[in-house]
Swiss-Prot record:
Belongs to the universal ribosomal protein uL24 family. It comes from Ruegeria pomeroyi (strain ATCC 700808 / DSM 15171 / DSS-3). The keyword Ribonucleoprotein applies. NCBIfam families: rplX_bact. The keyword rRNA-binding applies. The gene is rplX. This is Large ribosomal subunit protein uL24. SMART domains: KOW. One of its GO terms (biological process) is translation.
Length: 103
C-alpha cells in the first residue's frame, strides 16, 4: 500500500499523551506502521559519557503509530489523505480541500 504520510509532512497527533501537538515527520517505518515526529512522544534516555559525547539524561523522540497522526492541510486543519491519478502520475490529495499535497 502507498504511504499516506511521508517524511517532511506536517502532522497533528490525534490520540495519546501528546494529543493536539503538531510537528514534522523526521522518519517513517512503514513495516512497523510508525513514524518519529519531532517534539512529540519525548522520553528521557540515559546515555553513558564517551570521548565524543557528554552523556547524561537526553530527551529523544520515540516512534508514534501512524493511526494516531493526521496530515495538516493548508488551512492548518487535520485531514485524511487520498490518492488520485493526474495524467499518468499518482498523487496524494487532502480530502478536506481537494488540494494536491505533492506533485
Amino acid at each position: 500500500m502507498a504511504a499516506k504520510l511521508r517524511k517532511g509532512d506536517k502532522v497533528v497527533v490525534l490520540a495519546g499523551k501528546d494529543k493536539g501537538k503538531e510537528g514534522t515527520i523526521t522518519s517513517v517505518d512503514p513495516k512497523a506502521g510508525k513514524a518519529v515526529v519531532d517534539g512529540v512522544n519525548i522520553a528521557i534516555r540515559h546515555t553513558r559519557q564517551t570521548q565524543t559525547s557528554q552523556g547524561g539524561r537526553l530527551p529523544k523522540a520515540l516512534p508514534i503509530d501512524l493511526s494516531n497522526l493526521a496530515l495538516l492541510d493548508k488551512n492548518g486543519k487535520a485531514t485524511r489523505v487520498g490518492f488520485r491519478m493526474e495524467g499518468d502520475k499518482k498523487v496524494r490529495f487532502a480530502k478536506t480541500t481537494g488540494d494536491v499535497i505533492d506533485a
